[in-house]
Every structure is written in C-alpha cells, then in structure tokens.
Amino acid sequence: MKGGALHCRCSKCFAAPPKRRVKRRPRVLTLLSLPEDVLLYVLECLPAVDILSMREVHPHLRSLVDSHSSVWARASFQDVWPSPENLNLFERAAECGNFEACVKLGIAYLYNEGLSLSDDGRAEVNGLKASRFFSLTERLNSGADPFVWLFIRPPWSSSGSCCKAVVFDSLKEECGTVTSEEGATGALKGSIQYCLAKVLSLFEDDDKKREALGMLESSASHGCLHSSYLLWETKQKTALSDPGRYLQSFRQLRDYAARGCWDAQISLAKACGHKNQLSQEQRSASELVNQVFQSSLPINKTSIFTTQKGMNDTMRYILIDWLVEVATMKDFSSLCLHMTVGLVDRYLKLRSVPRAKLQLVGIACMVICTRFISKEILTIREAVWLTDNTYKYEDLVRMMGEIISALEGKIRMPTVVDYKDVLSHLIPLDRSTLHLCSYISELSLLYTELSTYSPAQLAAGALLLARILHKQARPWPAQLAETTGFTLEHLTPCVVLLHKKCFHDDAPKDYRQVSLTAVKQRFQDDLYDQISKEKVMDHSHLCELLGVPCRDSESPASCPNAADFHQFLCSPSGSKTKRRREDSIQEDRGSFVTTPTAELSNQEEDLLGDFLDWSLETSCSGYEGDRESEGEREGEVTAPSGVLDLSLLITEHQQCQDTTSDDDSLVPLHPIPLLSKLENGTHSTEGCAEKSSGYSSVSSGGSPTSSSSPPGLPFTPTPGLNHSKLMPIPFPQPCSPLFKASRRQVKRKNQAQHSEDNLSDEL
C-alpha cells in the first residue's frame, strides 16, 4: 500500500471482521416456573404424605400449601389409615374439607382401629370423636344419599357402653343445638336427622319408631328429600283407599321424582301400572317413566382390566360367582346382590387392587350393601369368618373405609333389578316368566361384555328374552315400547348377546375343570320354581325367530392358564361331594386357605386344644357391637378360625391322584364337609360335578354369626341349597409359607350344644 493512498470502505477494498454471535443460555425451566394456578393443581393431586415433602422443598411451595386449604381438601389418602403418627395430617385435611379423611377418621374412632386408646372410657371418647367426623362427612356429602347411619345402625353392644350409642346420642345432641334453620346448616341438620331416624326405625320398640317418624318430619321440614319420600311411603297405605288422597299422594310422588329422588322415580314408574290416575296424570307420569329408562347409561366394566393389570375376566367371574353363593346362603335379596356387584365394579375401576385382596373387596362391598338396604345385616365378624379368616377384622374395617371414600359415599345406584321391578308392574307377568327374567338378570352380572348396554336395556332385554323363551304371542307389546322407549328392533342385539353369554357359551371352569354355576344353583331352588332346570331354546333358533344372522362362533374363553388358576383359586369341595384338594403349592402363595372341614380326634383335641383356644380368642377382635347381637353371650359361638392345615404335608399331586380307593383310611386326606353331620344320608361323588359351582362352602349352621333371623329364633337354611358347599375364594394371603406348608385343615369340635332342628342364628 502506497503512502497517502486512500481506499474506500467497500466490500472489495475493505473486509470487515465478522460479527461474533453471542449464544444465549437456554432458560432453565423448573417446577417453580409453572403458573401458580397450575402449580396449585399439581399439589392438589399429590398424596397427603408427598404434600408435606413438597412443602419443605421451597418457600414458595410452603406458602402455597399453607395459604390454600384446597390443597388439603383434595389430598389423597389412598391406602393410608389413621394412626398416631399421621393423626395430625388426617385432622388437618378433615378440617379443610377432605371427604376421605373424614370418613376414615370416623370409622377409625368408631371401631377403635389404628387409633388405640386406653380401655377406660374408650367408648365415650371414641364415640364423641367419631360423631364429630361423621358430622363433617355429612356436611361434605353433596351428591349421595345420607349414609353415615349404616355405621351406627343396630345391633348395639349389650355389655357395657356402646360406641355406636355414644355416636347416636352425640349427633342427636348436635341437632338440638343447631339454631339456624336455613342454608347449609339447616340442610346438615336435615341429613343428620334422617340418619338418626333410619337408625331408630330399625329397632323393634314402638316408642323408637314413633320417635323416628317425628325426626323424619323435622328432617323433611329442613329440606331433606329422602325424609320426605320416607314419609310419603308411610302414608301411602292409607291414601290408596281414598281416590282424592291417592291423587294428592301421586302428585307428591311426582314432585319428589322430578327433584331427583331415585326411590321416588322407581315408585312413580311402578305406579304407572295402576289405573287410578286421571288420564292427564297418567300421561305425564308415563313421560317421566320414559325419561327414567332413557336416562340410564351403560357402565363400561371392561375398563376394569385397564386399572387392574393382574386381573382378567375369569377372575372377576370367580369373585362374582362366590358372592352369589354367599348371597344365596344368607338369603340376601337380588337387589342386594346387584348392588354389591355394582359397588365392586365401580371400586375396581377407580383403585388398583392386588389379587390377594379381591375377595376382601367383594365381601366388604356386601357388608356395606346389606347395611344400606337390608334389615338383616352381614356383620363384620361373620364376613371375616366367611373368608375362612383369610383376612382379619381390621382388614375388613379398613377396606370399608377405602370403598366408601373412593366412591364418595355413592352406594345406591340404579340396578337391573330396579328396572325389572318397574317392568313387572307395567304389564301382568306370570310367575315362571318373572323368575326366568330374574335368572337372566343375575346371569348378566357375570359377564363384562354385557356392560355395553345400560341397566335399563339389560332389564328390558331380560324380560323380552324370558317372554320369547316361554313362547309368548306378543313378547314386547306396544305398551312396553311406548313406556320405556325401547322397541323390539332396539332390544334385539341385547337379547341375542344375553342368550349367547347366559345359555349358549359354556360357563368358565376352574383348574379342576369344574363349571362355576352359582347362579344356576341359586335358581334351582323351589322358591324360584327350579327355573334354571328348564330347557332353553337353541341359539340358532332364537336368531331365526328374531331374523338376525346366527354367529355360532363362541367368543374366546377368558380362561387363564393353569398357573393363574392355582394362584387364584384352590381346590374346594363341591355340592354334595368330596373333591380332592390340589396339593401343589405355588411360590407366590403361602398356602391354600379353605374352609375347615374335619373334626379333631380326641388325641388331636388334647394336643391342639391350647392352640385352638388361643386362635379362637385372637381371631375375633374389633368393635363389640359388630361381633355380638343383643342376645348373644360369650361361649355360645365356635368360629372356624386358626385351624391347622396338615393335609399340605403331601405336596406331590401324583400321590393324590393315585389314592382313588374308597378305603376309610383315606378319610383324613379328604376331610368331611363341615355340616355333613347335619345332613340326612350320604352322597356319592359320582355324577355331581356338574351341580357344583366350584367352591367348598362354609355353612351357615357353623357360622359364628348370622343375621338372617332374630336372635333366639331357630335358623332355617335356604331351601334347596347345600349348606356345606360355600367356601371363600382362597386368594393368596401374606402368611409364612414355612408354617403353612406343615398345616392340615381341621375344625375344632363345637362346644355349644345344638341340634339339627334348632340352630341358633346368632349375629
């Protein structure tokens, strides 16, 4: 470059240095970077224990947790039970409006489960605390019927102070101190008075019944719809005799139904079958009935297996089949059975349940439902005994709390039985057709594939199928089509599937190839005219009558592998027969738990007496009011608990198969059914397999408690039912395999003297 020469700064003469790009650091996003409302929602979805951990992470999180009560109101306490260690956590959540915490605290104090107190004044202290949390529960109960009364209903303990009575008196005193008659306080008073009236109505004392009627009137004046309906029921009998009163009563019922009372809607639908109403009233009622049927929605039960990873359709079938046997043995109504199954399915859709606790869920749901709709209940002590003490008293109490809290107190839901009863009032039905319809309705409980149809459709389909099978000239008359809104064309697919699942396809079998047919056995009773023994029309013939193509291809049997069966169901004794036990033991099970079925010899009695005395004393713990009726005394009951199972000493399955002789020396290896001594004659094992549902059942005669008749009255078994065949499904239980492997199943001789003609039915 020459000196003094100037150059322009164009791109040809001058190359500017390139600009350096400054790399921006990426923004670090953390949980605290979320908007406050989103962060609050995250905290509300956490379990209660994790909320405390999150609170210690950052001051901002601590501020959110402390300043927003909604975090505690929506905190989850799933699988967590109140204890001295977490009591403050539960109480804080309950005060903030957590429904689950209130329910569990109330039950924990009532049954003295988890929150141990000294025996001195325990009933009084626990009762007052349980009353406080039950009152909070009803305050938070917005969408369900008042239900806390089912925990304090009779029987009450007759020895000393009763915690249930303390809760009742405390709630009654609370209602007397309420001064505000409007708003939420008045509604709470109405709900509590309804619960108190329900409890009083279950006593036999006339004075208590009159007091219950007065409480219902007070509750109805505070706006409790359920109390208004119960008052309507009490006045209905007198209104039937006077046309003017009947019309006024009918209009009241229509008003309650329009306000959402389910029982009123069902009663209104049944009333449409009567011709006492004026034509205008009949028309409006028919429209409401049509709305009741059309508003019924299907419950997709197949989603259960999305939540329950280790469960399949056959496992559910086995559970429901066992519940049917329990309901038959205890003579529970079909409505109670349908409610129980519905409660089981709804809970299984919400909460994941280990396979070992499926039976616990089933029996806990039955305890809840019998308390809710039946005068005779299944006590907690008896429910534990029905599972052959596979679970403890406290296990059942806690499961009841889990179910009630998970379902938010919604126990009573529409069932197939409700709609079936309405249909039976709309048109005249002969006895056999009604029994066949009930039979089909209970069979529908076993199959999840039928849940694609609503309960109203299933009830209508069951009635239509029953009338077709009985060759009715007009199986679906115009009156039913108009009232329900279901035409024959709409119901045809449901009818075909009902027939295919209930009559065409084979029932699932256990690993011993024994069909599970508890519903069929239930309807072989003379009470149902042995309707299940009737020959049913072929599936192809039905399809031909309905004008639909016949698909004979049977759906793939949801039958698990043999290994799954061994884990899920042990070898039980069948109906009127002695079946061999499967002696192989799976590693994931402690042992097979079956109903004690053998008597001890004198020598065995002397050797094992001390152990059995200890086991009987320790197996029946918990709240006394659920263990004894008012007439029961200690020493009158022998429960089959803590039994030794020595038959598992032989673990080779081939050894059992080789012992096919009828020699008497083999009797100890194949114990006699518990109540065989109460049956007349002996039954051979040949030709009886098809009559069994696949369970060896506990007998109500040896039951420690029974709620099917009042104390002191002789127990009458269900007609036509072999009471030596019921037995719990032996789900795997957490027991020591080393101890169980050397146990043999025996039953201690009953010390209480009783005869076949007079078995005390104790609670």
Curated annotation (Swiss-Prot):
Short motif (D box 1): ranges: 316-319
Family: Belongs to the cyclin family. Cyclin AB subfamily.
Keyword Cell cycle: yes
Disulphides: none
PROSITE patterns: CYCLINS, FBOX
Chain intervals for the UniProt region annotation (PEST): 589-747
All residue ranges annotated as the F-box domain in the record: 28-75
Protein keywords: Cell cycle, Cell division, Cyclin, Cytoplasm, Cytoskeleton, Mitosis, Nucleus, Ubl conjugation pathway
GO BP, sorted A to Z: cell division; negative regulation of centrosome duplication; protein ubiquitination; SCF-dependent proteasomal ubiquitin-dependent protein catabolic process
Biased composition (Basic residues): 741-751
Subunit structure: Component of the SCF(CCNF) complex.
Chain location of the short sequence motif Nuclear localization signal 2 per the record: 575-581
UniProt motif (Nuclear localization signal 1) ranges: 19-27
Name of this chain's protein: Cyclin-F
Basic and acidic residues compositional bias, start-end: 580-590
Source organism (scientific name): Xenopus tropicalis (Western clawed frog)
Short name of one Pfam family: F-box
Region ranges (Disordered): 574-600, 677-763
GO cellular component, one term: centriole
